[in-house]
């Protein structure tokens, strides 16, 4: 099941509930075409991977949370364990981007775009 997150407090509660398990958060918008294509995929993954926590944040309804999580484009998927973003990268381009913007000390795994295969592969890897 995909939990709908409406604000920062719900987000913190969601991450706390996930604890040591993987939490996958989709930042999206109901008006975004690629986001619409990913909704059924994301839901299907939540059914398939019962031991993973899944949540969706609509950036139009939660702009403060989107800003706090540094969401620049949608859909964006971030993965967490123990309330911390997972420290893996899938592409060198992302590392360079974070290095240039000063985030090298807080490396994260996230990716943007509607790539269902990549999302599922990374979820399996991090479980």
From Swiss-Prot:
Task: Show where the Thioredoxin domain sits.
Answer: 1-92
Please list the tissues where expression of this protein has been recorded: Testis-specific. Only expressed during spermiogenesis, prominently in the Golgi apparatus of pachytene spermatocytes and round and elongated spermatids, with a transient localization in the developing acrosome of round spermatids (at protein level).
Q: Name one GO biological process term.
A: cell differentiation
Q: What is its main location?
A: cytoplasm
Q: Which UniProt keywords apply?
A: Cytoplasm, Developmental protein, Differentiation, Disulfide bond, Golgi apparatus, Redox-active center, Spermatogenesis
Cysteine pairs bridged by disulfides in the record: 32-35
Per UniProt, subcellular location reads as: Cytoplasm; Golgi apparatus
Q: Which InterPro entries match?
A: Thioredoxin-like_sf, Thioredoxin_domain
Output the Pfam families linked to this UniProt entry.
Thioredoxin
**What Gene Ontology cellular component terms go with this record?**
acrosomal vesicle; cytoplasm; extracellular exosome; Golgi apparatus
Tell me yes or no: is DNA damage among this UniProt entry's keywords.
no
Domain of life assignment: Eukaryota
Comment field (misc): Increased levels, possibly caused by overexpression, are observed in morphologically abnormal spermatozoa from infertile men, suggesting that it may be used as a marker of aberrant spermatogenesis.
- Describe the family membership recorded for this protein in Swiss-Prot or TrEMBL: Belongs to the thioredoxin family.
Task: List, alphabetically, the PANTHER family matched.
Answer: THIOREDOXIN-LIKE PROTEIN 1 (PTHR46115)
Task: Briefly state the protein's biological role.
Answer: May be required for post-translational modifications of proteins required for acrosomal biogenesis. May act by reducing disulfide bonds within the sperm.
Protein known as: Thioredoxin domain-containing protein 8
Q: Which organism is it from?
A: Homo sapiens (Human)
């Amino acid at each position: 099941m995909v939990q709908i997150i409406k604000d920062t407090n719900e987000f913190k509660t969601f991450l706390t509930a996930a604890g040591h398990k993987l939490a996958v958060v989709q930042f999206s918008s109901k008006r975004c075409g690629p986001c619409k294509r990913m909704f059924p995929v994301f839901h299907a993954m939540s059914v398939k991977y019962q031991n993973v926590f899944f949540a969706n944040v609509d950036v139009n309804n939660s702009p403060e949370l989107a800003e706090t999580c540094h969401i620049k484009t949608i859909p964006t998927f971030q993965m967490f364990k123990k309330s911390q973003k997972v420290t893996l990268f899938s592409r060198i381009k992302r590392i360079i981007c974070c290095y240039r913007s000063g985030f090298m000390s807080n490396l994260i795994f996230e990716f943007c775009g509607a790539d269902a295969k990549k999302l599922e592969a990374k979820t399996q890897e991090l479980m």
